Amino acid sequence: MKLVLSLLLLVPSLLFAELSVPHFFSDHMILQRERAAAIWGKANAGAEVSVAFKGKSASAKAGADGKWRAQIETGTADANSAVLIISAGKDKIEIKDVLVGEVWFASGQSNMFYTMNRSPEYAGLIAESNHPALRMFNAPLVTAAENQEDIAGVWESSTPETVPNFSAVAFFFARKLHLELGIPIGVIKSAWGGKPVETFTSREALNTLPGTKALVDAMLKEEASYDQAKAQAAFDAKLAQWQSTMAAAKGKSAEERKRLPKKPDAPKRPLLTEGKPGVLFAAMIHPFVGYTMRGAIWYQGEGNAKSGAVPYDQTLPLMINDWRKRWADELSFYYVQLANYHAPSTVPGTADAWALLQDRMRLVLGTTPKTGMAIINDVGDANDIHPKNKKDPGERLARWALTNDYGKALIYSGPLFKSSTVKDGAIRVTFDQSGTGLKSRDGVALKRFEIAGADKVWYWAEAKIDGADSVFVSSAEVKAPVAVRYAWAANPEGANLINSEGLPASVFRTDDWDDVEVKVDTSVLKAAEERRALGEEIRALAAERAKLDRKSPEYQALTKKHTELMAKFKEGAPKK
């Protein structure tokens, strides 16, 4: 009898699930106004779940897997807090202090992750940042091999205590909307520094494009051959070497210590390694799929500005369309063009992966609907990939939203290339978004225009504003021009074309030369991967051998194997 009773007591925990919702359905959340907002979670299989909010109600039935989903009308924007009640039988969840307004998703890499407290000049603004109806949900940095249903985090209102840890770009974007619209604004921030666009895209979507499918295939091959024991042994060897180096560095000058190596990272499975294709989508994007919102803002690209990358005007639309398909909503999507970086260039015709990616960002505007781009080639820092000015990027993103989503009559972008015409030894370039007229920022002649003939030799050009929206470009060195570029460099110092709102013109080119995203020789990549794996095996063997007596047979056997592997390793070295 006791045994039967004990088993019966276990039944609820084995067969029934407690009513629950993801972490982002929590106190202080903001629901998208004037929509049927999706609410979902888990309950007992077959349970009837009801959702009530501000006199409205909705219901859903949990499936065999316990999952349920309901949609509830939110009504107009409302800064008065209300309670969202979810119930199933005797179980009840009360989510307090819920507002109704506009909700946006903020993602990308380090410049989106960059927090307010990293810019000293914002200290005064932070001290005055009491905005009870401006709220942010900050997602933690996590990885996952498979799509996740939940992620930790809490909603926080804007106060001097919370804002220091808010994404600066997202804060200035939300603050601009909040002040202009006078309604609650919520932002869900989910970003991770130093990561490429492919990691924020699902592997299913990546598999539809040849270039990105190759990245997924390479990762899965790496995953299949991953040996945790070998990886751990290699890490232990690296860690021991690092510890030895650090111990030897004690007492050295500060300048010498700057050159010391960083501590090696612990080994991770490829499918759990941040930055790998689809990994951050699974962990940090997928949990939010379906949250009812207006759109997304994006600041990323640094991790893709390199030779060999799949062109960004393919990968960014791939991600945008992937998100829209999963949300079943054509979300507005506004992104920040990369800022200036590196030493200023002084020679025309430079092949530059940074400028090429900036221009590919511009091209996305013409291929992907409901997108916008904040141009920031006037706020960069030659010595820091993280410009401290995050106010301009955030507020320029807000201009796109205020105009295209909220009906404000604004000039919402800097000048964007529209067309070019060659005539009488010169090229006339026409721009969109000129406002009431194009201008020079500093009042001097326009700079950073380049021109070339069929020989593909570039020269600095003379550029003159001609009318409200055109620039006349020519050079005495080029009698028969065929192509023109503007601001074509990672740091086009002196670029000074703006519109009547003071917003800078975007980089552009009319040619398709010097495509630095060269086709990758996959055989070279394969050889490099095999050599890397061989190197790890050698390090692991060396670490194992170091634990043995030099006179032992085991030591001698490992030495022989080590010699053989080293010979093979040297054979695979790249030919000079």
Which residue stretches match the model-derived regions?
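Positively charged n-region of N-terminal signal peptides that target proteins for export
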Residues: 1-4
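Cell-envelope and extracellular/periplasmic
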Residues: 18-566, 570, 575-576
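Hydrophobic alpha-helical transmembrane segments of integral membrane proteins
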Residues: 8-9
